[in-house]
């Protein structure tokens, strides 16, 4: 499913960049990721604005044209606070635990989330 989307995915981690790259490689996900960002680059932990804005600034895109997918509600809230669109994978926390932000998209797992994103975007394309 991920290769069908032909999405240019990036990761943004509170963890060590090297550890994240190894984790992606060990799970054969590195082929879908074009760049990995770490909070080490901005010396500020998510959900503060700096890590999210580092990514949008790097690619010179507006936050509202960027989609952050996460399984932690606090991460989605940080992304929403800087204007990013958000997608929530519910299977990790089981639901939005303490977030005041409602995600733009959600799914029980990554495949369901991707299907929901594609379905909504198809509806928007047809409606315009």
Segments predicted by a language model, with ranges:
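Asp-based, Mg2+/Mn2+-dependent phosphohydrolase catalytic module
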Residues: 3, 7-8, 16-17, 21-128
């Amino acid at each position: 499913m991920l290769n069908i989307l032909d999405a240019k995915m990036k990761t943004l981690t509170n963890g060590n960049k090297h550890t994240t790259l190894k984790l992606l490689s060990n799970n054969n996900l590195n082929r879908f990721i074009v760049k990995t960002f770490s909070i080490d680059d901005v010396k500020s932990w998510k959900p503060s604005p700096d890590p999210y804005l580092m990514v949008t600034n790097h690619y010179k895109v507006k936050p509202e044209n960027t989609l952050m997918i996460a399984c932690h509600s606090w991460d989605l809230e940080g992304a929403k606070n800087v204007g990013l669109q958000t997608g929530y994978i519910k299977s990790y926390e089981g639901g939005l635990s303490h977030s005041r932000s409602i995600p733009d998209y959600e799914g029980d797992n990554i495949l369901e989330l991707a299907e929901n994103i594609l379905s909504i975007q198809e509806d928007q394309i047809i409606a315009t």
